[in-house]
Amino acid sequence: MMRKLLFSALLALATASTVHAGGLMTNTNYHIAFDRMFARAATTEIDAAYSNPAGLAWGHEGWQLSLNFQKPWQNRDIDCSVPGFLGSNFDKKYNGVASAPIVPALFAAYKKQNWAFSAMIGIVGSGGFVKYDEGIPMFEVPIRAMLAQAGMMPDKYNYSANMKGKQYIYGAQFNITRKINDNFSAAIGIRANYYDGYNRGFVNANMTAVPNNIDLIDLQLDCIQRGWGFAPIVSFDYHNDNLTVSARYEFRTKIATENDTRTLSARIKNTDPQTAAQVPYIEGATALQQFGDKVAAYQDGAETRYDMPSLLAVAVGYDFTPQLRAALEYHFYDDKHAKMAGDRQKTLEHGTNEFLAGIEYDINKKFTISCGGQRTDYGLSDEYQQNTSFACDSWSLGLGGAWNINEKARLNVSYFCSLYSDYTKTQANYQGTPYTGTEIYSRTNHVIGVGIDYKF
């Protein structure tokens, strides 16, 4: 039993790398026009370099550039409740603070007659940092249960834990667009994706009695993961006066990261009365061997998969008047066939479905306002949700505006937020203990953005 509890704690620490921001593995908000309208897959403006490359066949003749900056704030909290735990109730909220510095994205496009060439650089997957200053339930509950088995109740020792992780997928995309006739265009492209992440954490428990202050358990992990992948992209666009219909397909990106493990260690107080005098601690390779093949995935040089799923995006846009435009859009991410660590993708009920709508209105020649919404359904299951990686279905709302500074320059500003549905998971034999526990996963998300578009 003790070995099982210790394994649960170490495994939680070792899998902390799967914490990420954004969707399951994909971001779509690169340009500020998306943040203030959402449905942008039928656009012919500069942000089409990502959302509708084929649409650039009807875009600005010559060069265009766009530089965008976003600042996100997120919370990812876990409410844990274990009735009757160690003779009382265990109720604790673990606050996860997810943040990122200013997130930039750069767009460029050049069109001449029937040809267009475009590029985009940004954070295309995951994105951000997350930190739990008090660890997570997968740390605390099994360790407290293990120490209670050895006769040590919570008032006899100090417990501390910390977990933080980073997960970015940087992308550089290049497209070639061809106008086929007066109504149809097509584009092909490729995106290079670079995964850069780490997970660092510790769990420590020591006796409060002085002068001994004996360490009972100490777990440490510092693992950096990096890897490359490439995604071909095809898109098509139909344009007829006020109507635009588009489709874009991104192929699955295989990303196999390689560990650069700086620290992977366990030090455990030996409570076996027959051997404790000679070997007071189990540590080093001997301690890790107790956990079998499970820790092998986090050894230096080991590989972990973080595939980005294939994506189908279809949209229709319509200009009701020269001043009023609207669009509807649908995304399908085939998450069930994008390999994740431990094959977790197989536990999803289905791939991610997203429904988007947006409207934009030109007040005059200088100012534009817009708003939009998005519904995201991940197909989540209890088996998929983990302390170290969880998602919540959401509604997102965005608004903002644009200022045409002159004929060449446009300033975009935006704000959007996501309203998440809490996910409740109840588990018998919670974290390897004989108790039933319940976890409630919740999230918040707010993003402000500013960007400048420039036409040469």
Locate each region found by the language model.
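A broadly conserved detector of short glycine/acidic/proline-rich loop/turn motifs that flank catalytic sites
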Residues: L11, F69-K71, Y415-C417
